[in-house]
Amino acid sequence: MISRLNREFALKTEPERRSAYADMLLSPVMHTDCTNARENGKSCQAYVCATPDGKALYFAREKKGHEGVKGTVTEDYQGILVLVHDITFYNYGSDHQECLAHVLRYLKASMENEPDCTWNKKIHALVQEMVHFRNGCRQPHGPDSEIVSGFEKRYREILETARKEYEDIPVNDYYKDGYNLFLRMENTCTTICCSCMISGYLPRIMKPKGF
């Protein structure tokens, strides 16, 4: 009975899902993730694709990696992908940004484990400021480019502070996550600033229910 209802629901929502799929391909930024789930009592991988306008699609797959990505929006997507560490996703999209919720979490860990550093506190506050500003922006075409450039300038200045601090304070052999985070943020500086300003902000991709 339940199985039949699920099948009927899937068939009836197919037009909506196809429409959402097409719309999501046009979004300048899309979040993607993969998490463990269960389908009909069996373990599977749930692939999630979500855009800032509220659209989200879930795909149950037997395998992770490229086999799991097949048939999802991510496979055909050509914009900026916001993701959590999974090197598979770096083969898709035109550019990549680590999920800001995770970045903020890692920065807090850096603040706790590297109390002598100042860059982590400064950039944590800046990212929060950027997110708050963008979420409060009511301009139809997004913030002015000069505002975005201003955020990027401050961002790069803080990263330069980080570089100098790590030159003065050698990386701890027992905690290298802060330094590695700095390197990732330096590599994706423009992407983080631009995507945060253009697309809005989704805190994180929630684990799907009902699998």
Give the positions of each predicted feature.
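Catalytic center-proximal scaffold of phosphoryl-transfer enzymes
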Residues: M1-F211
